[in-house]
Amino acid sequence: CRNVRIDNVTIHHSEGMAFIFQLCHNVSLTGCRIEPSENRLISSCADATHFVNCSGDILMKDCVMESQCDDATNVHGIYTRVQKIEGNRLYLQFMHNQQEGVPLYHAGDRLCLIKCGDMTAFGECRVVSAERVNGQLCCVSVDRLPEGIAEQDGVENIDRAPENVTITGCVTGKNRARSFLISCRGHVRITGNELHSNGAAIWISGDCRYWYESGPVEDVEVSGNQIECKNSGIVGWGTAAVEVVPELEQSPTYYHGRIVIDGNVFRKSRGPLVHARYVRELEVKNNRLICADAQAAEILTRCCTLHNRNNTIETET
């Protein structure tokens, strides 16, 4: 699908996700509401919105996502794994059953290859042709084999990723888990939102182990938001307001690029403000933190460069 626009649509209940977009180019949601009707407690039984290997521009503006049983949104791609190499043909496997059968590869697409252990990128190639073998497996012919390629390496289609993701003026809350999950290349702007989250408000990951959700972020700005995090201690929901936690073994380099957290108001009761690792550059500035104890101001990081300045802390009793 191309140029998908959904305006002022309300979904009161969904047995699964309320909105899911896959392999779409240019998607906008404006003024949409995912919220239960008067006699219901739950809106969607999974994520409110979900974007898989979409490209072009993704816009979410003035939307309300409340009372869903999982995250407000998740924007990501898919890692497949090399199961067999025959000449210039790669047999690629979808590793999670919820991804099986996705027509992910097309002639001309650029592929990035990674070592799944430390998720280090080591080469690129282009798709010449692609065909489906079965629900789990596809055969992709490429223009060349990157040096060092081996079975069990990970493959990401970097042409099936958004150039711009903009989330602005949205409200999330009353839900399980987290608010915004972002694992994609391109420019990401999360601005002027009101987020109420039981786990992390912003979750940036990437993994080649279980969900196989790609990929590294390159340019993320989180600014001018009102963020309230309970960080209730549920495993997998995050202990920080902003979690940047790629699932990898010890890596010799960074996985994510530049992340800026600027001019937000955070309200937290426990856990650190930011937990980030394997990030090239992290900037935390001009934020106001209202918290119950000093631990909530901590920034736990294993980043190449950290800029932490002009943040204020107010302690509540």
PLM regions and their residue ranges:
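Extracellular parallel beta-helix/beta-solenoid repeat domains
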Residues: C1-T317
